[in-house]
UniProtKB/Swiss-Prot annotation:
GO terms for biological process: translation. Belongs to the universal ribosomal protein uL4 family. The gene is rplD. Part of the 50S ribosomal subunit. Residues 43-95 are annotated as: Disordered. It comes from the Bacteria. The keyword Ribosomal protein applies. This is Large ribosomal subunit protein uL4. It comes from Bordetella avium (strain 197N). GO terms for cellular component: ribonucleoprotein complex; ribosome. The keyword DNA repair does not apply.
Amino acid sequence: MDLKLLNDQGQAATFSAPDTIFGRDFNEALVHQIVVAYQANARSGNRAQKDRAEVKHSTKKPWRQKGTGRARAGMTSSPLWRGGGRAFPNSPEENFSQKVNKKMYRAGIRSILSQLAREDRIAVVDTFSLESPKTKLAAEKLKALGLDSVLIITDTVDENVYLATRNLPHVAVVEPRYADPLSLIHYKKVLITKPAIAQLEEMLG
């Protein structure tokens, strides 16, 4: 698979990328599965409701068991009563995680990268570095490359690059092992350094 190789001025040449990573068929069902699993595994428990033991209530029986003609009632915390506890309350300990085995996950990442390559959403650079941790420098460099919304995948995240890009709203910098399926799909472009491609090939090939 041929990808665009950009220099610092944004001028393009051709880079021959491995077909094992960038030349696979698109498997929509698999990609959907790993994206949903990734989102589910990122969820944190923040829902809480009270059951009948946790709501504030009196243990006094509202009325006697027999003789009133009304339905029997034991206490006001019953889920049947207004203000009572929930029968099956949501809990912050609820587990939303979904398991995807490594073989499927790697195949899904290869499928995403291949589709991005076909859509011309991947570009390659030799390296990506900055002289100082200035956001202005990072913005100017990305503008010269013709990139605004971009996921930068580099073999090692340079401290200057990290500090300079962290305040840019549509830019993220990650190492190959942290390139998740949601980020790959989310950004308009993916910029990969040559050493990072070698790492991806080793991880996914």
